[in-house]
C-alpha cells in the first residue's frame, strides 16, 4: 500500500504512548482465543519438520503457524476467518443447509482474497524501500526471520481487504477472458470447432494418458509448497 494514501497521516513519525495498544490486543486475544480454537479459526498446527530444518524461523522459537503473526495481525486475521465462517453458515441457513454452486465459487474466491492478505501481514513481511510497498512473506520462497517487519492496515477503508478483493477479481476476469467464449475469446484458447468447450485434466506430467497432438496446452506447475517448505 502506498503510504501517501493514508489520508491525513504523515508518511512517518515517532510512535506516541497512545500508539502502544499491545496490552489491549493481548487482552482481546485472551477473551477470543478459546472460542476461536473451538471453531478451528486459530492456525495452531505445527510447521512441518522439513521447513527450514533447524535454521531460519526455528532458531527463534517459531514452530507453530500462529507464531508467524504478531498479536494484532493474528487478531485481525482470526476476525476475518470468523466473519467468513459466519457468512458460510448464513448462506446455509438461507438455502436449507445447502450451498449453491454459484455461492461455493464466490466463497472460494473470497478465501483466495483472504489468503492474499495473510501473505502481506506476517512478522516475515518486509518493506521494499525501492517500490515503497509491502513485500509478501513468500517473496523469498522461504520462512525467513526479520528483526523488523512491514504490515498493512487492514481496517482502513480502501486498503488491504478492498485491495486484495480487487486483485483477486482482476485475476479472475483475466482468466475468464483467456478461456472464455464469444467476444471474450482470447488467443490462448482459440475457437476450433469445439464450441468453446474447455476441458481441464489434472494428473502427473510423468505419464499423461492422452494421445499425441490431442491437447492445446500442457502446464507443468512447479511444486511451490515443497519449494517453500
Predicted regions span which residues?
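Nucleic-acid modification enzymes, centered on SAM-dependent nucleic-acid methyltransferases
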Residues: 1-211, 227-229
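Local beta-strand N-terminus motif with an aromatic residue
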Residues: 214-215
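Hydrophobic beta-strand segment of the Class I
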Residues: 218-219
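Conserved SAM-binding loop
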Residues: 223
Amino acid at each position: 500500500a502506498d503510504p501517501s494514501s493514508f489520508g491525513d497521516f504523515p508518511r512517518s513519525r515517532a510512535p506516541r504512548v497512545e500508539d502502544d495498544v499491545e496490552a489491549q490486543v493481548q487482552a482481546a486475544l485472551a477473551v477470543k482465543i478459546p472460542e476461536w480454537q473451538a471453531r478451528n479459526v486459530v492456525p495452531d498446527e505445527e510447521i512441518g519438520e522439513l521447513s527450514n530444518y533447524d535454521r531460519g524461523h526455528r532458531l527463534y522459537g517459531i514452530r507453530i503457524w500462529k507464531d508467524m503473526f504478531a498479536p494484532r495481525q493474528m487478531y485481525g486475521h482470526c476476525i476475518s476467518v470468523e466473519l467468513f465462517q459466519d457468512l458460510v453458515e448464513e448462506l446455509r441457513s438461507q438455502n436449507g443447509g445447502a450451498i449453491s454452486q454459484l455461492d461455493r465459487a464466490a466463497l472460494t474466491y473470497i478465501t483466495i482474497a483472504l489468503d492474499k492478505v495473510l501473505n502481506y501481514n506476517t512478522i516475515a513481511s518486509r518493506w521494499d524501500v525501492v517500490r515503497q510497498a509491502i513485500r509478501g512473506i513468500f517473496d523469498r520462497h522461504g520462512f525467513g526471520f526479520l528483526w523488523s517487519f512491514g504490515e498493512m492496515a487492514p481496517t482502513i477503508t480502501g486498503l488491504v481487504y478492498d485491495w486484495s478483493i480487487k486483485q483477486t477479481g482482476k485475476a479472475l476476469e483475466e482468466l475468464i477472458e483467456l478461456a472464455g467464449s464469444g467476444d471474450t475469446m482470447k488467443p490462448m484458447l482459440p475457437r476450433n470447432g469445439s464450441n468453446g468447450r474447455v476441458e481441464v485434466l489434472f494428473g502427473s506430467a510423468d505419464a499423461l494418458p492422452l494421445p499425441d497432438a490431442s491437447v492445446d496446452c500442457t502446464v507443468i506447475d512447479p511444486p511451490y509448497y515443497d519449494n517453500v517448505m
